[in-house]
Amino acid sequence: MSSPTMMPMSLTEIAQAVDGRLMPTTVPTDEPVAISAFTDSRQIVPGSVFVAIAGERVDGHDFVPKVGAQGAVAALVDHEIAGAQVPQIVVENTVKALGALAKHNIERRRALESLFTVIGITGSVGKTTTKDLLKSLLSKMGDTVAPVGSFNNEIGLPLTSLKVNAGTRFLVAEMGANHVGEIANLTSLVPPDIAVVLKVGVAHLGEFGSAERIAQAKSEIVRGLVPGGLTILNANDEHVAAMSAIAPADVLWFGLPQKEDAQLDTTALDVRCDDLDHPSFVLEDKTGRHANVTLGICGQHNVMNALAAATVAMTLGMPIDAVASGLSDVTSISPHRMAVSTVTKPETSFTLIDDSFNANPDSMKAGLDGLSRWHAGAEQQPFRIAVLGAMLELGPDEHRLHEDVGRYAVEGGADALVTVGSTSDEALDALAEAMAQGGKAVAADPTMVQWAHDAEQADRMVTRLATDHEGTVVLLKGSHASGLSALAERWTQN
């Protein structure tokens, strides 16, 4: 049997935890045979519980008959699957049952005497990078569980929480939301001991309706703290700072110095970026202790993410020198986040800055700032191309916001702008057109602003531009629906 990733449980215990009905079976039901849980049947190993979820394209129930042969000890289902050679626990809703199982697993871990701390992270931007930095730091202090990529919703968070076992010291829980109430639901499953709020931006503005509603949603992580839990807030964001009023206990502040009277627990002084857009700064705590940091990842915006991670790590006992060296050691984070590589094609080659995981106006501008800083001090300046996909869920101002980003790209130093829409989605295509119009309005040479109807066309446009201009650097940034992350993978695999 594989090594346990969750607290070992019997089938009877699981059925009780998820309020399910254990179908008659010949296998022992009171022995702790379950040691892991998955929703992807391809990940099943001996000792796994398979949670069958009906998705938009695939229904996990179709795979229940196969998982027994892979070693699954049980399947959570919303209806009995006839003929399946695996014990079945029937529940009303398998997504909710997954959450209930995760909640039970965390409660089992908390019941042990050994130390265990849950750190919850939310914000409109920066969650995954902060999670990656914090996991790297905390792993030096004890066994740390954190999601792969951005598993931060009602499925991803429980799956991550089901990797917690008796040896786990820290759980870093990324919590995302598209609607008010989602983070409250996540904290009801996994209440954090420490809540970190990074930023309230305009991501998902169309779903929420206003920045105030976004702030309300993000504040649910503070309300969901365990009694006496610690709140860590970005002092430079007024919506985030206002959450101190609902904090149940102590509040710690991180941010850049802006006012002499600001009481910052963690700050960055003398922030600079080199020609490869790697930030360096002096990390300082509230006692005046300081240490030099040079981030191994790109983007000045990541200074704030590093400060958030540093605040947590120092609060949990890591010395500032160890934090600084730990931050400097991180050279790679989750895919498609300011990842730099060289793309070689038969016709040409260019440098790629792949930030294609997702996009909103704030992260777009941060990525464009990084592009403008790329070899900014070089005698021979690179030819900078911004390849930008449409942004989703921005509400009634979406066209104006796209025009603003197009204008920002050109005014910020992009030599060429390629906006990417969709041949199958007229709304997405119209947003890409609006971005191109914003760029053309301020471009010295409007022919350097091009509108692509899909990633394939964008590929051809970039190839032509890079062939004509030596020393090309390309920023790739857009919402997942624009298909740019797939383009990045094709480029880098080639």
Model-derived regions: residue spans:
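A short helix->loop->beta-strand "cap" motif at the edges of active sites that frequently abuts
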Residues: 70-73, 86, 225-230, 247-250, ...
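Short, conserved loop/helix-junction motifs that constitute active-site signature segments
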Residues: 69, 189-190, 222-227, 245-247, ...
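Extended acidic/charged loop-beta regions that coordinate divalent cations
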Residues: 27, 164, 175-205, 241-290, ...
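Short, polar loop motifs at secondary-structure junctions
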Residues: 75-82, 235-239, 256-258, 422, ...
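Residue-level signal for inorganic ion chemistry
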Residues: 14, 48, 67, 101, ...
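Short, basic phosphate-binding NTP loop
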Residues: 2-122, 129-140, 337, 428, ...
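ATP-dependent carboxylate-amine ligase
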Residues: 1-19, 46-49, 59, 132, ...
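Phosphate-binding loop of NTP-binding sites
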Residues: 15, 97-235, 239-247, 468, ...
